[in-house]
């Protein structure tokens, strides 16, 4: 509670909730998710809906509509940041998907490599190594599929 009180002091007294337009976040979220997942979008949403329709909606509205769609950073910047975060967490399938998404939004492989490598700067060498191994797998898969 002390931290919330302090936050209120710093953030100001703006108590007006401006609300949001669900339709805007939903359409922006679907657009962003389709950009990142490409032809795998329908399969992703279908898979998530199969066990939780609510989670599928949350994913689009909150994750891709609000978080990835908000001002401050571009979609490219956000997606490549997610690659770093997922590398730190060692979520292989998600790292791979977001590396692919990064490439789809025109982030170069060199930048993806640097972002993952930078985990070593925060003493996360094993996470960096893990993420780089997924990047290597991604590159090999793309070379072999051509």
Question: How would you describe each model-predicted region?
Answer:
Residues 87-91, 121-122:
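Short Gly/Pro-enriched loop/turn and capping motifs at secondary-structure junctions
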Residues 57-60, 89-95:
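Short acidic alpha-helix initiation/capping motifs at coil-to-helix transition points
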Residues 71, 84-89, 102:
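Short, glycine/charged-rich beta-strand-loop motifs at protein surfaces that mediate ligand recognition
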Residues 1-75, 104, 117-146:
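Acidic, glycine/proline-rich low-complexity segments that act as flexible tails and inter-domain linkers
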Residues 77-86, 95, 115-116:
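Short, structured motif recognition centered on aromatic/hydrophobic residues
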Residues 92-100, 105, 113:
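Short conserved catalytic/interaction loops centered on acidic-Pro-aromatic/His motifs
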């Amino acid at each position: 509670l002390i931290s919330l009180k302090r936050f209120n002091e710093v953030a100001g007294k703006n108590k007006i909730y401006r609300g949001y337009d669900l339709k805007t976040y939903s359409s922006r979220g679907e657009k962003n998710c389709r950009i990142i997942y490409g032809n795998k979008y329908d399969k992703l949403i279908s898979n998530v809906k199969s066990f939780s329709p609510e989670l599928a909606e949350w994913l689009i509205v909150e994750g891709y509509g609000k978080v990835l769609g908000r001002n401050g950073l571009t979609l490219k910047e956000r997606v490549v940041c997610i690659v770093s975060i997922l590398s730190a967490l060692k979520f292989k399938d998600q790292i791979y998907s977001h590396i692919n998404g990064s490439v789809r939004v025109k982030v170069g492989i060199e930048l993806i490599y640097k972002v993952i490598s930078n985990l070593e700067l925060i003493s996360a060498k094993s996470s960096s190594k893990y993420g780089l191994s997924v990047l290597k797998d991604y590159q090999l898969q793309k070379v072999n599929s051509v």
